[in-house]
């Protein structure tokens, strides 16, 4: 329960007046003690009651404080009951209101209202919530996200190299997919011969391209088995495509299987013969400048090479266009005129 409000006027009852004097006198001395300790000041209280009895309080020594008082001659603050009443009226508090702690400087009713509202608003108003902002995604991440490529050959995976305008698939389980091209494409497209030096021998490859050379040997045996239409051979779709920079492809990674017709409709490559289709079996990174020209991956071009008179007898007549040379690997290959027809524009990039 709060303190009972009383009217600030002379108490007529003698007993009540005596009790109130005793309590408030001690309260006044207690406040003087707190002020002297907290603010390091000298305080002297001199009180005479209605019966003219003296009550005094001094923070240190009354005589010393009174001596300082009599010797002090500078202007100082001096208050009376009239000054206190005027200050209370200016603050909007009557004499019958609750006790008010006197603060430094006068405070009007508007200032007190703002201070009260500010204290209530600071304790009751909730703090503004700050929500974390998601990091902005780049345009490439918004369009699609490509999972990281797994290094090494995947014997059961089938697929083809995506073009620039195609969207890569999110996930392709191993063993499922589509063949590289249908049998109808084999009859209409001719693979370009492997890159050979002018003297008819294979060029010396850098140490980083040894794995790709082994992959090309695998493609030789692959195409030699597909010379005749009736002879079965390893399926072209059994060779999975490697990510750039991987050299783990070897002849033992190829799986055996027949060619399957493609369930997809013919792409734009079958309609437009002037657009090359770049499909690689083992792909290496871009060659460094100043090094010898690397061996290009085996690819299928839509451009038909003109028949060469010197090499027409090396292939059977049953198949219209040769896929690869049928001679064994130990026998040196003869340079043909088709090597001079390869231009840098036809190399896959």
From Swiss-Prot:
Highest expression found in embryonic heart and skeletal muscle. Low levels found in adult spleen, lung and testis while no expression is found in adult heart, brain or skeletal muscle. The keyword Magnesium does not apply. Residues 237-317, 330-349 are annotated as: Disordered. Residues 3-57 form the MADS-box domain. One of its GO terms (cellular component) is nucleus. Residues 58-86 bind DNA. Its main location: nucleus. It holds the Pfam family SRF-TF. Keywords: Activator, DNA-binding, Nucleus, Transcription, Transcription regulation. One of its GO terms (biological process) is regulation of DNA-templated transcription. One of its GO terms (molecular function) is DNA-binding transcription activator activity, RNA polymerase II-specific. It is found in: Nucleus. Transcriptional activator which binds specifically to the MEF2 element, 5'-YTA[AT](4)TAR-3', found in numerous muscle-specific genes. Activates transcription via this element. May be involved in muscle-specific and/or growth factor-related transcription. PANTHER family: MADS BOX PROTEIN, MYOCYTE-SPECIFIC ENHANCER FACTOR 2B. Belongs to the MEF2 family. Heterodimer. Interacts with HDAC9. Interacts with HDAC7. This is Myocyte-specific enhancer factor 2B. It comes from Mus musculus (Mouse). The gene is Mef2b.
